[in-house]
Amino acid sequence: LSIVLLLPPSTAYGQLESVAKNLLDGMSKMLESGKVRFSIFMDGPTLEAASKAARPLMFGRFRKAIEEGFLEILGGGYHDPMLPLFPSELQAMQLEEHRKLLWKLFGIEPNGYFNSSMVWEMEMTELLEKNRFDYALVQESALQDALGRTTPIAGWYSVEDKGSFLRVVPVSENLSRAIANDDFQWQEIAKHYCRDGRSAVVALDVPPQPGDIVPFFERLVDFVETNDLATKTVSCAVNEQLPEGQLSFLLSAGRRIGLPSTAKTCRELLIRRPEVNLLHKSLMTLYRRARSNLKDKQLLEFYKKLLP
């Protein structure tokens, strides 16, 4: 089992410093157990809050856990935006700002890309490859649509677009939901994924309330120990498995962004939500004006202020 821990964008938290402190304590408890290997994504502001809240030597222990394969820090956008909605320059800046922070705090360059909305468009293949990502996490349902299947999908697939190559790794929505809800049938669901050396990938949401975070990690350790589960980081699982196939097209409208299940692309937000469309148009207008009138350092500084 590969466990991915997710936090919503930092703008969702009213007490980010308290969230960061409890998150670090929870991660430390899980690593101290020696039983759980896991991957986690934190956006830029959360990482910065964590660096201020960390106790002495804490990040040193995290670095050691990364080296030993117990912890993987996933990469993504600094503010965790839906990248396809923004110009490629701003997309690349989001990824680079987050990458710089991971290097500063952990001394690593991330292998895996994650976005909390799980949005995907083929144009992201080139962008992520240029930013040195090896794989991206996507919804299993998106792969099922692309393959014309309804059966469970595990392992990883390759996507190719305009000569760029990337691995995509499905996150099992059904298994994630079953484990999160303490559904006793989770083992039966897992059997369909964990066959022939494959590792199922599940995504679990870290609670938004600071006081619930450490108990969440404690329950997760207990769950792994009670069921005697073998866990791997996603990066480790991907490197140990052979490809399941190749995709020429993959599209996902993602999750939790206010679109119906029938939506095919996140761009439908611009049609269904006038306020989102207005904000998007305003941002694009500012971007084009800046590109026409500013140069070099001034342009870069403006882009940073414009990052969604």
Indicate where each model-derived feature is located.
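Alpha-helical scaffolding within the catalytic cores
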Residues: 22-26, 52-68, 147-159, 183-192
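Surface-exposed loop and adjacent secondary-structure segments within mature catalytic domains
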Residues: 121-170
